[in-house]
């Protein structure tokens, strides 16, 4: 059985970005117990191999490995992971010197309701909105958000949700539905029987939510903000 697991773990060295390959790799990582030192050690070795490859761009597989190692019950594994990736696996780039370490920590801890609130706060600041005057965005604010920052926020959500969440994932769903908003709300789980979900109790604050479920946007204010977000130049050649 252990040899079989070792063979399965070795498949994680493959750094394919195909949807099917990523799905299988995520399933392998999920089978690893947090208190199994030998499996965690092997996983840590593979993690080092993956992220130190020249010009390698991390994805949600690395995100789940990072979470599994960092949330393990072994101090040696935690120390190794923290030293290897002191700021996580996503480069925290910002055009406005925004600190994303706090968002990264919340996502790794799977504290999604706090991460969602913090995401909205950061978007408001990035758009240059005075929080004392209003704590929401107009569609005209969206273009003020730098490309680099929007991509960083999206990459954090994607990396730490097994590829399920983030603005780009939402955008892909919206485009696949030919920009039909009613179908979009239903698909990502923001409406039940055509009635907007009540915040926060009717939303899913874990990875069991529908694909594209998070981060949230207040659809009661209309579709213009999300439409502007999905049309942002951050997604050009992304």
UniProtKB/Swiss-Prot annotation:
Query: What Pfam families is this protein classified in?
Result: GUN4
Cite the entry's keywords alphabetically: Chloroplast, Plastid
Per the record, the similarity remark reads:
Belongs to the ycf53 family.
Q: What SUPFAM superfamilies does this protein's entry cite?
A: GUN4-like
* Official protein name in the record: Uncharacterized protein ycf53
InterPro entries the UniProt entry points to: GUN4-like, GUN4-like_sf
Q: Extract the Gene3D superfamilies matched here.
A: 1.25.40.620, Gun4-like (1.10.10.1770)
Q: Which gene encodes it?
A: ycf53
Lineage, opening ranks: Eukaryota, Rhodophyta, Bangiophyceae, Bangiales, Bangiaceae
């Amino acid at each position: 059985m252990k040899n079989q697991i070792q063979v399965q773990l070795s498949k994680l060295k493959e750094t394919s970005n195909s949807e099917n390959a990523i799905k299988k790799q995520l399933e392998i990582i999920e089978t690893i117990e947090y208190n199994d030192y030998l499996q965690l050690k092997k996983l840590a070795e593979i993690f080092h191999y993956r992220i130190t490859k020249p010009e390698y761009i991390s994805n949600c597989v690395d995100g789940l490995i990072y979470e599994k190692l960092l949330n393990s019950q072994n101090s040696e594994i935690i120390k190794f992971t923290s030293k290897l990736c002191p700021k996580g696996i996503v480069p925290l780039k910002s055009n406005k010197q925004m600190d994303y370490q706090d968002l990264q920590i919340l996502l790794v801890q799977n504290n999604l309701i706090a991460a969602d609130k913090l995401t909205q706060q950061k978007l408001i600041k990035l758009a240059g909105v005075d929080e004392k005057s209003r704590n929401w965005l107009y569609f005209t604010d969206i273009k003020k958000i730098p490309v680099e920052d929007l991509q960083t926020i999206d990459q954090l959500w994607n990396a730490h949700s097994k590829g399920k969440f983030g603005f780009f994932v939402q955008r892909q769903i919206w485009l696949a539905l030919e920009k039909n908003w009613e179908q979009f709300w239903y698909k990502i789980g923001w409406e039940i029987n055509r009635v907007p979900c009540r915040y926060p109790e009717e939303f899913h604050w874990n990875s069991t939510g529908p694909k594209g479920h998070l981060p949230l946007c207040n659809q009661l204010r209309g579709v213009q903000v999300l439409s502007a977000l999905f049309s942002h130049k951050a997604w050009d050649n992304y």
